[in-house]
Amino acid sequence: MLTNLIVDGNYILSRMVFALHKNNLLYGSLRISLDNTISTYKKMYPFKKIFLVSDSKEYSWRKKVYKSYKENRKKDSDIDWEFVHQCYSEFKKDLKNVRVLEEASIEGDDWIAYIIHKANEIGESNIIISNDYDIKQLLKWSIDPHYINIMTNETFNQTKIFFPENYQIFLNKLKSFNNDDIFSLNDNNDFINLLNNFSLKYTIESINPVHSLLLKIISGDKSDNIPSSYSVKKNGRNRGIGDKGAQSILESYVNEFGEISMDDPDLLINIADIICEKKKIGKSSIDGIVENLQLNLSIIDLRLHSFPENILSKINNKYKNV
């Protein structure tokens, strides 16, 4: 089965930097660790293409949409970041048989979204190595064309694998395929074995991509300084909607309106209405909440039609020439 590997370079770099710095091994081991990690990934499966994506060194295009985007990010001053960036640049230049994608104003998850979209159009699957949970909205599967997108990462010494909801249906369909082409059959078996090995070794989380996107739109994202769609000041602090509160709002939506469609023109209005009911505030607050939901959607949504045209054009041009 034709499958691509997408490696979030910022994820593997930061994971190694902090671990090596803690053990006073940064200068002697960073480059070796990066090389060994990519080598290990290459051996996982005969991937059609391997991509390494990185955030731009410049501000993201999202800063123009929301000027406080990622404003709370601070680098550890004890780490020699000049050395880290120099080492990482040399590592990227020396990579063989890996397509490196990085461009001004474009973030790693923008590249991941684009690669996945292009691959899925022609029936190619993707394995993403990242701890960026915005990527959860891209985890899905299809029978025609036939593909699946999964994500894996390691946090706190625990490796997780994120499968799209009901992925077993996809695997069962893959197993049942009758194909006279013995090479394609073998490819399918190899891919099934890879996913089975993941399932045996790693902690599995099942992801509903639409719910994953909406949960972040409702609750915001503190790590990126994206505010909650609704907040109230208590004891001098803004109290927004947390993960559990957002989950409760989505459950109420499904109970009242049925399964969620991102194409529903009344989606955000109905969510805002439920927020008003949950928080026991007047309906006059709906318009303000909808504006906040729309802002968060414009920042978090990784569907390509949500990207500014100039950004999408830059991504497309770089992708074609890499």
Annotate each predicted stretch with a short phrase.
Residues 1-95:
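Domain-level signal for Mg2+-assisted phosphodiester chemistry and nucleotide/NA-binding surfaces
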Residues 21, 72-315, 319:
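Extended two-metal-dependent nuclease catalytic cores across DNA- and RNA-processing enzymes
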